[in-house]
Design a protein with these regions (language model features):
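A sensor for short, sequence-defined functional sites
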Residues: 1-285
Length: 285
């Protein structure tokens, strides 16, 4: 296998994998390098790359298929409460599958158990250095990657999360404030560029769903107008909303990134969806 393999020279291959013949007669690649601690038998971090099966009937070069974004979902659901002093209290649950699961679960499968709590706390400290982890529930055995998709629930308190002003509080939604950015590989792609002449790569196709409810102190209202936005293209889709009902603000986002390897022509659709997603990051009460 290799990210790009020419038709003849064998020295373009960088490692060997295996294939299994399915009942349909098609061949499915298996990669023993990445199967341990991964919930798929072929690493989708290597989708859209060349491989050459060594089969009795012979084969030409093949291309590993695109993996649907929903195979690699990451979902964060937060329920928070903000007081007039700017202290945020609440809980969030993160769930993930596929390559997103492997990214989040890695601290359990590759890290020291004595450091689990510190590493989980660091996710909150990325949001605010004043964050306090009250409790965390990662199930009975988070190393058992074959049992189910990863699920972790945090309870926390963050003093001075919101910046108080004259009869106002300014803050960013927690689910968009450096929370588990490690799995959001698309954030490492500069979407300020208006156009690209060449193709580009992300870590993996991915589905990102972010939901947050924030209960405001009595008398506070959202200054920004309610927001609904959607984008669709062959490269990426986005749908998001922000609204207030009573004393609660509700944020919802769904970002589907459909490939790992993109052509230059995909840039406008990818960039538009990711920038729309980012635009929900700031608002003021």
């Amino acid at each position: 296998a290799g990210s790009r393999v020419e038709s003849i020279p064998a020295d373009h291959f960088n490692h060997c994998v295996a294939v299994v013949k399915l009942s349909s007669g098609t061949y499915m690649p298996l990669d023993p390098t990445w199967v341990p601690f991964c919930r798929e038998l072929w690493s989708s971090a290597e989708q859209q790359q060349n491989y050459l099966p060594g089969v009795p009937e012979g084969s030409d070069l093949c291309l590993t298929p695109v993996s649907a974004p929903e195979n690699h979902y990451v979902r964060i659901k937060a329920n928070n409460k903000l007081d007039a002093k700017g202290t945020l209290t609440g809980q969030f649950t993160i769930t993930a599958e596929g390559q997103s699961d492997s990214n989040i679960r890695g601290m359990f499968t590759r890290g020291w158990q004595s450091q689990w709590k510190n590493m989980l706390e660091s996710q909150l400290l990325n949001v605010s250095p004043k964050a306090r982890l009250l409790s965390v529930d990662y199930g009975k055995d988070p190393k058992d990657y074959q049992a189910a998709p990863i699920k972790i629930t945090f309870r926390y308190e963050i003093p001075e999360y919101a910046i108080p002003g004259k009869e106002e509080l300014v803050f960013k939604p927690m689910v968009m404030n450096n929370l588990y950015n490690q799995v959001k590989s698309y954030l490492r792609i500069n979407t300020d560029l208006p156009e690209r002449q060449y193709g580009f790569k992300d870590g993996c196709s991915r589905l990102v769903e972010l939901d947050e409810t924030i209960q405001l102190p009595k008398g506070y209202t959202l200054l920004n107008e309610a927001k609904n936005e959607s984008k669709q293209s062959d490269a990426a889709d986005f749908k998001g909303s922000l609204s207030q009902d009573g004393d609660k603000i509700t944020l919802h986002q769904k970002l589907a990134l459909k490939k790992r390897v993109y052509e230059a022509a995909d840039w406008d659709g990818f960039r538009s969806a990711v920038n729309a997603h980012k635009s929900f990051g700031d608002y003021k009460k």
